[in-house]
UniProtKB/Swiss-Prot annotation:
Description of what induces expression: Expressed in the late phase of the viral replicative cycle.
Organism: Vaccinia virus (strain Western Reserve) (VACV)
Protein's name in the database: Cell surface-binding protein OPG105
Subunit-level organization: Homodimer; disulfide-linked.
GO BP terms, alphabetized: symbiont entry into host cell; virion attachment to host cell
Keywords: Disulfide bond, Host-virus interaction, Late protein, Membrane, Transmembrane, Transmembrane helix, Viral attachment to host cell, Viral envelope protein, Virion, Virus entry into host cell
Lineage start: Viruses, Varidnaviria, Bamfordvirae, Nucleocytoviricota, Pokkesviricetes
Stated family: Belongs to the alpha-carbonic anhydrase family.
Function field: Binds to chondroitin sulfate on the cell surface to provide virion attachment to target cell.
Subcellular location: Virion membrane
Domain (Alpha-carbonic anhydrase): residue spans on this chain: 1-235
InterPro entries on file: CA_dom, CA_dom_sf, Carbonic_anhydrase_a-class
Topology, Virion surface side: 1-275
Post-translational modification: Apparently non-glycosylated.
GO molecular function annotation: carbonate dehydratase activity; zinc ion binding
Length: 304
């Protein structure tokens, strides 16, 4: 059978339950970004340290790089789709099987060599303070085929979605140069339109006519599923799959991001301005309570 090309549209109702898909162990606490690149086609951040294990993985897969995709408009820009719903953008985290193979180049030659985690970006009216760390670096790589040191403290854990249930399938890298197992989190992280628009100001490598060309979009359209391609789901996706992610409660996600922002202010100002820090942590507790009760109400509505 022909190789399944990526990306794809995931039909949640056709995904197959698999008891082997346990929660992933994500160890990004020691991952450090070293350089950020404008490849002329996308933004790439190279990492040192960090790995994933657990779940269905036979051993540890070390983090290699992060790639970001977007579109001309905020309404679309992700490579993968969930029930034909396209998100504003997509982050791909590329990992390789270091225990089994001696290098990334060697690992990409094998169907168990690469694992790619996909995180969707959804534009709302609230800035993501963690994603802003990446946005702040873009001025240093505005020209195509340039790279620069990533000169800011950045914790990749903060870009993980609030729910880590996932879909998985065997496909290819986005450029189809190698096989890859995909792990796709259907719960997105939220960013602001201004943050995403900054990526569209980067120059592309197609500059043959002497005029500046910008990377206004770089996402790929989905490929048709092969007859033998199987998509699996984990955890509580079986319940979430009855409702398309496009219909999720965006207000709850906005509150969750606001809570994270308040907590970051608390950590930042606890030494400099204790009064402001106390106000921030009070808001964290209030928002946590609101989210708890709204989550219970939302769960009851889905059951009815």
């Amino acid at each position: 059978m022909p190789q399944q090309l990526s990306p794809i549209n995931i039909e949640t109702k056709k995904a197959i339950s698999n008891a082997r898909l346990k929660p992933l162990d994500i160890h990004y606490n020691e991952s450090k970004p070293t350089t950020i690149q404008n490849t002329g086609k996308l933004v790439r951040i190279n990492f040192k340290g960090g790995y994933i294990s657990g779940g269905f993985l036979p051993n540890e897969y070390v983090l290699s790089s992060l790639h970001i995709y977007w579109g001309k408009e905020d309404d679309y820009g992700s490579n993968h789709l969930i029930d034909v719903y396209k998100y504003s953008g997509e982050i791909n985290l590329v990992h390789w099987n270091k225990k089994k193979y001696s290098s990334y180049e060697e690992a990409k030659k094998h169907d168990d060599g690469l694992i790619i985690i996909s995180i969707f970006l959804q534009v709302l009216d609230h800035k993501n303070v963690y994603f802003q760390k990446i946005v702040n670096q873009l001025d240093s790589i505005r020209s195509a085929n340039t790279s620069a040191p990533f000169d800011s403290v950045f914790y990749l854990d903060n870009l993980l979605p609030s729910k880590l249930d996932y879909f998985t399938y065997l496909g290819t890298t986005i450029n189809h140069s190698a096989d890859a197992v995909w792990i796709i989190f259907p719960t997105p992280i939220n960013i602001h339109s201004d943050q995403l628009s900054k990526f569209r100001t980067l120059l592309s490598s197609s500059n043959h006519d002497g005029k500046p060309h910008y990377i206004t979009e770089n996402y790929r359209n989905p490929y048709k599923l092969n007859d033998d391609t199987q998509v699996y789901y984990s955890g509580e996706i079986i319940r979430a799959a009855t409702t398309s992610p496009a219909r999720e409660n965006y207000f709850m996600r906005w509150l969750s991001d606001l809570r994270e922002t308040c907590f970051s202010y608390y950590q930042k100002y606890i030494e400099e301005n204790k009064t402001f820090a106390i106000i921030a942590i009070v808001f964290v507790f209030i928002l946590t309570a609101i989210l708890f009760f709204m989550s219970r109400r939302y769960s009851r509505e889905k059951q009815n």
